[in-house]
Amino acid sequence: MGVWLLSLITVLLSLALETAGQGERIIDGYKCKEGSHPWQVALLKGNQLHCGGVLVDKYWVLTAAHCKMGQYQVQLGSDKIGDQSAQKIKATKSFRHPGYSTKTHVNDIMLVRLDEPVKMSSKVEAVQLPEHCEPPGTSCTVSGWGTTTSPDVTFPSDLMCSDVKLISSRECKKVYKDLLGKTMLCAGIPDSKTNTCNGDSGGPLVCNDTLQGLVSWGTYPCGQPNDPGVYTQVCKYKRWVMETMKTHR
């Protein structure tokens, strides 16, 4: 789609933030292989999807700061929303990054502490946190239960995946200008509609078996060719994640 005017991007980002409570979604993706994402979490409001998330410890889920609620019903161990066989655990404590901005989406990362530990199994595993930041061009997979159509919404019952590649900050700034912060990460496929959308926020971007990103924001309607998805770059927050879990264990 080429380079957007900053004013238009600002409007689109505002629209994206207005729908952030529903998160981001997978556009032009495919049904994930069953059980291939045992770290995937659904944050529910009642029985309805609120955001995605990713298990990083038996007591802790990592998600986007804009997914903040007073309490959460956390579903683990199933690729289907509402699966009666899934683990469901209440969570009443969550810790946003202290530098999070609702206006700019900078530091869009949050830890949710489960009220009781998960039961680890082949269907429930913690994701591996990154030892380093992966370079542009790295192949990754993003997953979630967000809407598969935009602007009209169609929420799938099955976990959806999309294969994308990391994009350099230099290239991504051609689209998003100064809206792209230093701890934000872009991913997508050139000339493709493949992207995240409402309902996917906080979900994992996994590259080489490590967590590199959390779904944060993008343009609206979703799936605009050459408008990459924007993620929180987890490798730049590992110290904060470890210290926060230690402080509130």
Curated annotation (Swiss-Prot):
Propeptide stretches in the record: 22-25
Active-site residues annotated for this sequence: 66, 108, 201
Region annotated Serine protease, chain positions: 26-246
Tissue: Expressed in skin and, at lower levels, in lung, kidney, brain, heart and spleen. In skin, expressed in high suprabasal keratinocytes and in the luminal parts of hair follicles. Not detected in liver and skeletal muscle.
GO biological process, one term: positive regulation of antibacterial peptide production
Pfam families: Trypsin
Catalytic activity: Cleavage of proteins with aromatic side chains in the P1 position
A GO cellular-component term linked to this record: extracellular space
First and last residue of the signal peptide: 1-21
Similarity-based family: Belongs to the peptidase S1 family. Kallikrein subfamily.
Entry protein name: Kallikrein-7
Organism: Mus musculus (Mouse)
Record gene name: Klk7
